[in-house]
Structure formats: C-alpha cells, structure tokens
Amino acid sequence: MSELDDILTTEEAARLLRVSARTLERWRVRRRIPYVEYPKQGAWAPIRFRRADILEWLRQHVVKPNRNGEAA
C-alpha cells in the first residue's frame, strides 16, 4: 500500500467510520475530526482525510468504563 492509498475521500473515510458522508461533513465543518484541505482549485478546495488521522481520532474517542462498569 502506497502512502497515497492512505489518503481518503469523504466517502471512503465515512465508510471507514461507518457513518454517512453527510455526518462526516458536519464533523469536518465543526472541526471535530482532522482533515486535509488541498489548495483551492477554482472556487473550492478538495478535502481529504488521512487514514492514520482517522484511526488515531477513533483511539482518542474510546469511552472506557469506570470501576462500577458505567461509562466514565
């Protein structure tokens, strides 16, 4: 797998996270998830996601149970 294979479109990243592309777009606009904004091409800038960033973001959002078995 090349380094470019680790660059995901919105649809690919959404599939990896098992959420809709619209949900991922909302998270991105609210800056809740890391993304890469390429230089503008005309009126818009292509958005991509790095697989490593997505996986790290997932690790950071694991909710661990406390001693009583309830979410902390």
Model-predicted segments: where are they?
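Polyanion-binding surface elements
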Residues: 1-30, 60
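A short, Lys/Arg-enriched interface patch at domain edges and termini
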Residues: 51-72
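Helix N-cap / beta->alpha transition motif
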Residues: 9, 50-51
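Short Lys/Arg-enriched helix C-cap and helix-to-coil transition segments
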Residues: 36-46
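A residue-level structural signature of the nucleotidyltransferase/glycosyltransferase Rossmann-like core
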Residues: 5, 46-47
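Proline- and acidic/polar-enriched loop/turn elements at helix boundaries
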Residues: 26, 39-40, 70
